[in-house]
Amino acid sequence: ALGVGPGNTPVIMDSSCDIQKSVYSVIHSKTFDNGMICASEQSVTAIADIYDEVRAEFIKRGCHMLNKKELDMVREIILSPAGTVNPKIVGQPAAEIAKLAGFEVPADTKILIGEVTSVDVSEPFAHEKLSPVLALYKAKDYETALQMAEQLVSDGGYGHTSSLYINVNEKEKMAEHAARMK
């Protein structure tokens, strides 16, 4: 086996992407083995003009958008005191993580999603979570989304994984993504 260390797998959903397929793909990946695979998505950054549709699609497919109180409760359990992923959440179902945080969600909840704004290391949702917990960011445009993804990769460990959901005819944007994700 070849290991490359921690990863923080940011995803960008460009305005040109197929939203239904993109959201389905993230859910499929994030729920396989309850997100324990290091290449599973840790955050989704949606461009502002599709953000509401992306958010609604996640909800429609059984994901739970954390309210402010729940968001803070989950923030408290994502990381261990040492600043690494909390082993108590790794590979646990979303409902168990919610219970650990102190609230209830339906047992069939697929992912706990925190709508956050900061990609700084001070934000627990900006870290690798190895569980069905996902950060959701809104970027005003594609360039901003790339900058956010660059920061997440930089803080999470170069040389791992990033994803882009985009129309295949957007060659320049795809090339820019490939050049900037290290």
PLM feature segments, named:
Residues 103-182:
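Conserved C-terminal structural/oligomerization subdomain of aldehyde/semialdehyde dehydrogenase
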Residues 1-120, 145-147:
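ALDH superfamily catalytic-core signature
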